[in-house]
Swiss-Prot record:
Protein's cellular compartments: Cytoplasm
Name of this chain's protein: Probable transcriptional regulatory protein ABC1956
GO BP, sorted A to Z: regulation of DNA-templated transcription
Classification via HAMAP family: Transcrip_reg_TACO1, Transcrip_reg_TACO1_YeeN
Organism in which the protein naturally occurs: Shouchella clausii (strain KSM-K16)
Keywords: Cytoplasm, DNA-binding, Transcription, Transcription regulation
GO CC, one annotated term: cytosol
Main localization (coarse): cytoplasm
Length: 238
């Protein structure tokens, strides 16, 4: 199960190295999570999960604090969660999650990013049934067998555990996100390189070099949109 998480994170880090784009996206997501519940992560599981993910991207504390204070301050700025589904070259499947304060603008922008790069936006439900939502936790310092033993001792279930380079990647049901992290923290793991909720495709597809280049250009165009928070797909980019 899964994708090359280290490769994905390295690509994102390289892409965002000279911009504040990723911080702006996290700022928005943190604000929305804090506004929808308590601004205290210990009392708000959604906010806690966003903050755990933000740590893996080294989001500055100032960005996090500003977003939470904005939510505390009673800002009337509101965002809606929207999911768009579509197809890339050769029928590759794509899911786009967005937070927007203008649904018409975002839908138009996402549709254009698909259309200008060899893809097309589909209707709701056209591809999501081919993906499963999972929690993904990654860390160094243990083997897959050791990770399994830790989870078994803590009575926490995992869907799959793999080793990728020097990193152990654990896939679990979404409602086990915090339980998995807590089990490993109790076993001495202090830092996580991956802490995500993801949509994992049932089956991945491989594209030819030229088609893959076009597909990656399309994904980049979608990810560059201000309102887009996450993009998932079923293409093996290894």
């Amino acid at each position: 199960m899964g994708r090359k998480w280290n490769n994905i994170k390295e690509k994102k880090a390289s892409k965002d190295a000279n911009t504040s784009r990723i911080y702006a996206k996290f700022g928005r997501e943190i604000y929305v999570a804090a506004r929808q519940g308590e601004p205290d992560p210990e009392l708000n599981q959604a906010l806690k999960a966003v903050l755990e993910r933000a740590k893996t991207y080294n989001v500055p504390k100032s960005i996090i604090d500003r977003a939470i204070e904005k939510a505390k301050g009673g800002s009337d700025e509101s965002y809606e969660e929207r999911r768009y589904e579509g197809f890339g070259p050769n029928g590759a499947m794509v899911i786009v999650d967005a937070l927007t304060n203008n649904v018409n603008r975002t839908a138009s922008d996402v549709r254009a990013a698909f259309g200008k790069n060899g893809g097309n936006m589909g209707v709701s439900g056209s591809v999501a049934y081919m993906f499963d939502r999972v929690a993904v936790i990654g860390f160094e310092g243990k083997t897959a067998d050791e990770a399994l033993e830790i989870l078994m001792d803590a009575d926490v279930d995992a869907k799959d555990i793999i080793e990728e380079d020097d990193t152990v990647i654990v896939y679990a049901e979404p409602d086990q996100f915090h339980a998995v992290q807590e089990a490993f923290r109790n076993a001495g793991i202090e830092e996580f390189s991956v802490a995500e909720f993801s949509m994992i495709a049932h089956n991945e597809v491989t594209l030819s070099e030229d088609v893959q280049a076009q597909f990656e250009k399309m994904i980049d165009a979608i990810e560059d949109l201000e309102d887009v928070q996450q993009v998932y797909h079923n293409v093996d980019l290894a």
